[in-house]
From Swiss-Prot:
It is found in: Endoplasmic reticulum membrane. GO terms for biological process: 'de novo' protein folding; budding cell apical bud growth. Residues 1-23 form the signal peptide. It is a single-pass type I membrane protein. The gene is ROT1. Required for normal levels of the cell wall 1,6-beta-glucan. Involved in a protein folding machinery chaperoning proteins acting in various physiological processes including cell wall synthesis and lysis of autophagic bodies. The keyword Glycoprotein applies. This is Protein ROT1.
Amino acid sequence: MKLSTISAFVTSALLATVGHTQSDSSSVDDLEGTWSSKSGAVITGPDFYDPIDELLLEPTLPGISYSFTKDGFFEEAIYQVSANPKDPKCPTGVLIFQHGTYNISDNGTLTLEPYMVDGRQLLSDPCKQEENAVYSRYNQTEKFKRFSVYVDPYHGRYRLDLFQFNGAPMPPMYLAYRPAMMLPTVTLNPTQEASQPENTGSTRAKIRRSIDNRKVTGIKKHSVVDYNSLWWFGVSMIAAGGAGWYFL
């Protein structure tokens, strides 16, 4: 077999691999998992919101995270900090938690329907609030015109692009966990209007056990595949093969 034939074969295989990873998809199977913006500091689950004590836990850096299951549940965690142009010493910060169900329509629209009683928001505006931030319920249905999942050619990681209903892109997110790192997909803090169970203490105990179990079983941090390194490994193998062919 000639060197040119070997090189062509290996190059074709590498191009096929990279080309496949760069093709995008918008299926439920590809959407599954926990996605986080570039900093990776914001992740859905018990490290962002404690449903037992109803606490929003501030991450080290701002960011967004969305999680999806194959059977139609979602969770979102948002931490945003906005500068105050009039007074740089007074930035505002907001923490938002929601979870519920989602639906993908035939035209690719992604709709998130949160559980009305479970959403929480913590708003901090130090120049308007002398001491404490404002903690309140939060309920906002979200619609995305479309979404796309593919391997980012630069970072070599699975990437999720969400496009708002007006077509504007959200910050890109990267796969952090699959299956998703999420709180239980049931109503966490039911009210009387939401058909509250008779034994609330028992319900909270079940939620706590579920959270503890999710921390130790079935959830794995997604490893990063460096496709640039894979490409250069292939090139080096071609070069080594060429050298070996030359000295035969």
